[in-house]
Amino acid sequence: MSTNPAGGLLPLIRLLQLASPALPVGAYTYSQGLEWAVECGTVRTEADARRWIGDVLEWSLARFEAPLVARLLAAWADGDDAEVARLNEDFLASRETSELRAETVQMGYSLVRLLADLDAFAGLPGWKARLVALDTPAFPVAWTAAAAAWRIPADQALSAYLWAWLENQVMAAVKAVPLGQSAGQRLLADLGAAVPALVEAAQCLPEAEWSNFTPGLAIASSRHETQYTRLFRS
């Protein structure tokens, strides 16, 4: 078995680490407005959760965050730090509520601290300095730095990024609705089947066509800020 970081199974192992729910960045504490959708009665059943999560995946993640992640992977790999900084600013500006912005800033900060402490990342020449030089790195910016440094193929990295988001949303629904564990697995199986096509489309979507226009999500997130009883931070 190859132990070369540029080939063999090691990039896959690193990818599994990045996509793991055990990654200590606090993702499990956020629902991205889903908790308010449950509170107001929009999401009450497994079918409701499938529709809500699927819509956010299709209309926000796939049309904005996914192509931005693809562009970030290329910019990191090409050494284009100016492009990385521009995309970071674009992503921060795209967060429509204080909770959504605080979420990506906190998770980005936590991941930067983690990577700086991992020899597997910090020991690679130049990568730590490039990452810590960024002002307020958003989570996808820090995440793609690790993926690029570990030479994970772009399509695999993007698939794992979307899967990790999807898994977190489904687990939030399981807790908040609540749903059973089997229902959660059905949601992952059904919604996960769309990921390959979304990844392929995201990699060739022109920047002029990027869009995260999801007013329902923005309203849910803003209403969650004053929700009386909450399990989640967003």
Curated annotation (Swiss-Prot):
Q: Name one GO molecular function term.
A: nickel cation binding
Chief subcellular location: cytoplasm
Q: Which GO terms describe its cellular component?
A: cytoplasm
Query: Which Pfam families does the annotation name?
Result: UreF
Superkingdom of the source?
A: Bacteria
Question: What does the protein in this record do?
Answer: Required for maturation of urease via the functional incorporation of the urease nickel metallocenter.
Looking up HAMAP family in the UniProt record yields:
UreF (MF_01385)
Q: What is this protein called?
A: Urease accessory protein UreF
Name of the encoding gene: ureF
